[in-house]
Structure formats: C-alpha cells, structure tokens
Amino acid sequence: LLQREGYRVVLAADGLQALERLQEERPAVVLSDIEMPRMDGFDLARNIRADSALEDMPIIMITSRIAGKHREHAMELGVNNYLGKPYSEEELLSLVRSYTRAAAAQGVVA
C-alpha cells in the first residue's frame, strides 16, 4: 500500500531489527505490529521513547489486539496512533501523509 502510494518503505522482521535499522536511518514514521518475534511492539515503542535521538519519532501501531487495555498500554508507552485490524487504508494513508509532511518541514527524509 505505502509503496504503491510512492513512499519508501524499510522493513524489519522484528523489534530488534527495527531498532538496528533506526540507528542507520531515520524514517518519518514507524509502523509496528504488537506481535513480533524477539521483541514485541510494546518493547519497540519503549526503546524508541527511551532513546534521546528517537524519542520524538511518530509511532503508528497496527494490530489485531483491539481490547482497550492494549490500546491504553500503547498510549502509555507513547504510541501516537493505534489502528485495529482491519483498518481503513485511507486512515493509515492520512496518518502517514501527515507525519511525512511534518518530517519534510523539519528536513527528515520520508
């Protein structure tokens, strides 16, 4: 979806690999599931917020865990947006668009 819309997408197999990639480059926004091997999305968000170089990076969590307790926990960790599956493609694109515009205004590559 995002590539089709012209965005450059960098993939990671899990949270640990995502953190490694974030040391190499800074995307405009991070999209993460909760359920991943080695490091889940909650731990990824916690690590991003604990890193002074990444702490303001927008995080969109996309997950099948739609219970309120999961959403609340994500928000407590600093997740910016929480989308339950199935989600609206337009909603996701709108969020990504807003974050990439903000990043472009700050000189961050989208």
Give short role names for the model-derived ranges.
Residues 87-96:
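C-terminal output helix
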Residues 65-66:
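Short, conserved "switch-loop" micro-motifs in signal-transduction and mechanochemical regulators
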Residues 1-10, 99:
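Two-component/phosphorelay signaling modules centered on CheY-like receiver
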Residues 25-31:
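Active-site beta3 strand of CheY-like receiver
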Residues 36:
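Receiver (REC) domain active-site loop signature in two-component systems and cognate sites
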